[in-house]
Regions:
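Small-residue hinge/turn detector
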Residues: 207-219
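Glycosyltransferase-associated regions of secretory-pathway enzymes
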Residues: 2-206, 222-408
Length: 408
C-alpha cells in the first residue's frame, strides 16, 4: 500500500509539471505568433484552459511557493540565531573588559596618605556582606609543584583540593609569586608590602599572605599540609544561607589542661590553616592592620637596639612557635576574631562573647556572620575510605599539622 501511494503521488506530480510546461509553451507561442488562438494576452490564454487543469496548476505552484518560503524562513532563523550568538559573545567580552578596566582604575586610585592603615585597606577593598563567596582556592608553599622538594603528601592534598572542587579556580603560589601578587594587590598601601618583606620566617610570610589574598579576593585559603575530605559547598549547613555568612573558620585547640600556656597563647584558639571568607571582611582587615603595626614596632625596636638589619626570632623552638603565633598565627587570629564578636557595631552581637561560647563545641555555630565549626571539621582524624564516603558529615579537612616553619 505505501508503494502504491508513492507511485500515485509521483504520477500526479509529473502530470502537474507537464501541464505547467504545456501552459508555458502555449503562452510563449501565442505571444510570438498569435496563430493558435485569437486570445491576445496572458489572461486570455489562462482562461482558455480547463478548470481542473488550472486548479492542479494553482495547487502545484502554491505548494512549491510554500516550500520555498519555509526554506527561506529557516535560513533567516539560522542567520538570526548566529547574529544573536555573536552579539551575546561581544557583550560578554565587553563586560569582562569593563570589569578589568574598573579593577585597574581602582588599583590606580590612591587612598589619602594621611589615612590610617585600616582606612586605607577599607578604601582599597570595601566589604559587601551580601556578596557570594568567590569560587577561589588559594595555597602557598616555598617550592613549586615541579620542584623535587615538594613533599608527596602535600602534592596529594594540593591535587585533591582541585579534584573535589571542579568549579573553583585553584592557585598555588611559591615564595616569589606570592611576593609579586602582594606587591600588585597592595601597591597603594606600601606599609603592607614593607611588613611582608620584613617578616623573619617563611611561615610568617605564609600566614600574612593568606590574610592578604583573602582580603583582596576572598574564597578559601588552605595550608599546604591539608587534605580535603568533602567539597567546599558541604561546609555550609542546610539550614543556613551562604548569604548570611561572611566567614567560615574552625576551632584549632580547646585545652582543658592547667598547663595550656606552655603550648599555646590562648586556651581556646581558632584555626587559620583553613579559612573561607568574602573579600574585604573586617576580621581580615584587622588582622592585616595589627600585623603591619606589630612589624613596624619591631622594626623601630631593632633600629634602636642594633642599628637595624633583618628582624629575627630569638629563643628555643617552643618560644619561637609562641612568638609566631602572637605575631601572625593562631593567637593574633583568635584575638582579632573575638574583638570582632565583641564590637557590636560590626557584629551586631550585644552580649559579651568569650571562649566559653565555643568550649567543647560539637556542631557548627553561627555568631554574627561567622560560622564556627568544631575542631574535627578542619582537623579531622578520619581516613578517607576508598569509596570516598565520609561517615562523619562534619569531617571536612584533614590537617597534618606539619611544623613547616622549622625549615623556613
Amino acid at each position: 500500500m505505501p508503494k502504491y501511494q508513492s507511485s500515485s503521488n509521483n504520477k500526479g506530480r509529473k502530470i502537474l509539471i507537464g501541464t505547467a510546461l504545456v501552459t508555458f509553451a502555449i503562452i510563449i507561442i501565442t505571444f510570438f505568433s498569435g496563430s493558435l488562438t485569437p486570445t491576445k494576452d496572458l489572461q486570455g490564454v489562462i482562461s482558455s484552459l480547463p478548470n481542473d487543469k488550472l486548479l492542479g496548476l494553482s495547487n502545484f505552484l502554491s505548494s512549491e511557493n510554500s516550500k520555498n518560503q519555509d526554506e527561506l524562513l529557516n535560513k533567516i532563523e539560522k542567520l538570526n540565531k548566529k547574529l544573536f550568538q555573536a552579539q551575546d559573545a561581544k557583550i560578554n567580552k565587553l563586560e569582562e573588559q569593563n570589569k578589568l578596566i574598573l579593577q585597574e582604575l581602582k588599583l590606580l586610585k590612591s587612598p589619602p596618605t594621611s589615612a590610617s592603615i585600616r582606612d586605607k585597606l577599607t578604601y582599597l577593598y570595601p566589604y559587601d556582606s551580601e556578596s557570594k563567596f568567590p569560587a577561589y582556592i588559594w595555597q602557598s608553599w616555598k617550592h613549586g609543584l615541579n620542584d623535587e622538594r615538594f613533599d608527596e603528601k602535600f602534592r596529594q592534598g594540593e591535587s585533591q583540593w582541585a579534584f573535589k572542587n571542579p568549579g573553583f579556580v585553584h592557585e598555588l603560589f611559591n615564595d616569589d609569586t606570592a611576593h609579586t601578587v602582594i606587591k600588585y594587590l597592595y601597591q597603594q598601601v606600601p606599609e603592607v608590602i614593607e611588613a611582608y618583606e620584613l617578616l623573619p620566617e617563611t611561615i610568617m610570610k605564609m600566614d600574612f599572605f593568606k590574610y592578604l589574598i583573602l582580603y583582596a579576593k576572598g574564597g578559601v585559603y588552605a595550608d599546604i599540609d591539608t587534605y580535603p575530605l568533602q567539597p567546599i559547598p558541604n561546609w555550609t549547613p542546610e539550614n543556613v544561607s551562604p548569604l548570611d555568612i561572611g566567614m567560615i573558620i574552625a576551632i584549632e585547640s580547646d585545652s582543658s589542661s592547667p598547663d595550656w600556656r606552655k603550648e599555646q597563647i590562648r586556651r581556646l584558639q581558632f584555626a587559620q590553616f583553613v579559612i573561607q571568607a568574602k573579600p574585604g571582611h573586617p576580621i581580615l582587615r584587622e588582622a592585616i592592620a595589627q600585623i603591619v603595626e606589630q612589624t613596624s614596632v619591631k622594626k623601630l625596636e631593632s633600629l634602636a637596639s642594633s642599628g637595624g638589619g633583618p628582624l629575627k626570632l630569638i629563643g628555643n623552638t617552643n618560644e619561637k612557635s609562641l612568638k609566631i603565633s602572637q605575631w601572625t598565627g593562631s593567637a593574633i587570629w583568635t584575638d582579632v576574631v573575638f574583638k570582632y564578636f565583641n564590637d557590636y557595631i560590626q557584629s551586631s552581637v550585644f552580649q559579651k562573647v568569650t571562649w566559653k561560647e565555643f568550649h567543647k563545641l560539637q556542631t557548627p555555630k553561627l555568631v554574627s556572620d561567622i560560622l564556627v565549626l568544631p575542631v574535627k571539621s578542619f582537623a579531622s582524624d578520619v581516613e578517607e575510605p576508598k569509596d570516598g564516603k565520609i561517615e562523619d558529615p562534619l569531617a571536612f579537612v584533614k590537617h597534618y599539622a606539619a611544623k613547616i616553619w622549622k625549615s623556613g
